[in-house]
Design a protein with these regions (language model features):
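Exposed, low-structure sequence patches enriched in small/polar residues
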Residues: 1-267
């Protein structure tokens, strides 16, 4: 592609096998791309939502990552990214506390481009422990952003854990897997959603998160038939807390039961 929207992408990686159980990986990434059209040009019947940002520069991202994959110790990876000309939506400076209190933030959202470099570090560890018919699958994620202005918000710590039991039952006529999912992330300034733009925008007024999400599940397989039953967000009925949010002003779903059946027909 050529012209104002031209960009470039470079990816390279290397893998070194230490032995049968352990592997080292490394990768670099470099990209330059124009912001999406919503940032550059937007037209609507609403007076406040018409702009043309011809002065926006290409967003530059340089990344380096390393990984250690072990069948015994688990998988550990780290990635560092430096982002220049980071493009984002947020509210303008003329918004008042009264506007925020009245829930009128959406009327002040505009596209912006950060002039300082945003440094983003991500470290992830994955490991599954197994004992007889029990397994515990774990994913831990640590994130840190170094920035002069708070334009990129992420939770500092995220964990996802699944404890499950797997076994053949009824003289091996059925295979069953049942357990519990646990998800959690630390509180942070969760991006808000703008329905007119169809985009998320940065907000630094209110933190969300720091609550667990518990799901119970049962999966079963009988020949070509698969069945699942899932109780999602179980902890919402176990506590009196009712302020779970998926985004500002968008409540997270309540407790729900989901049932499914997959039956494959063979000729």
């Amino acid at each position: 592609m050529s012209g104002d929207l031209a960009g470039n992408l470079f990816d390279a990686g290397a893998l070194y096998k230490l032995n049968a159980n352990n592997t080292l990986t490394a990768a670099i990434h470099s990209s330059s791309k124009a912001p999406s059209f919503n940032f550059l040009l937007y037209q609507s019947d609403y007076e406040n939502f018409n702009w043309q940002n011809d002065d926006f520069q290409r967003q530059q991202t340089q990344s380096i990552s390393f990984g250690f994959n072990s069948k015994l110790l688990g998988n550990l990876s780290a990635k560092y990214s430096a982002i220049d000309n980071y493009t984002y939506f947020t509210t303008t400076d003329d918004i008042t506390q009264e506007d925020i209190a009245d829930g009128n933030q959406n009327a002040f959202v505009r596209a912006f481009q950060e002039t300082e470099t945003v440094n983003y570090l991500k470290i992830k560890y994955e490991k599954e422990f197994s004992w007889r018919k029990w397994s515990l699958n774990n994913t831990f994620l640590y994130q840190e952003v170094d920035q002069n202005n708070q334009v990129l918000n992420v939770p500092e710590f995220v964990t996802r854990n699944t404890l499950y039991f797997s076994s053949d039952v009824f003289n091996k006529a059925m295979y069953i897997q049942t357990g519990v999912n646990f998800k959690y992330f630390t509180a942070y300034n969760l991006d808000a959603y703008h329905p007119l733009l169809g985009e998320f925008y940065t907000q630094n007024n209110e933190e969300f998160g720091a609550f667990p999400l518990l799901d119970l599940f049962i999966n079963a397989k009988v020949r070509q038939t698969r069945i699942f039953l899932k109780a999602e967000h179980l902890n919402s009925i176990l506590t009196n807390q009712n302020d779970f949010y998926a985004a500002p002003n968008y409540p997270y779903r309540d407790f729900v039961l989901r049932f499914g059946l997959v039956w494959n027909f063979f000729s």
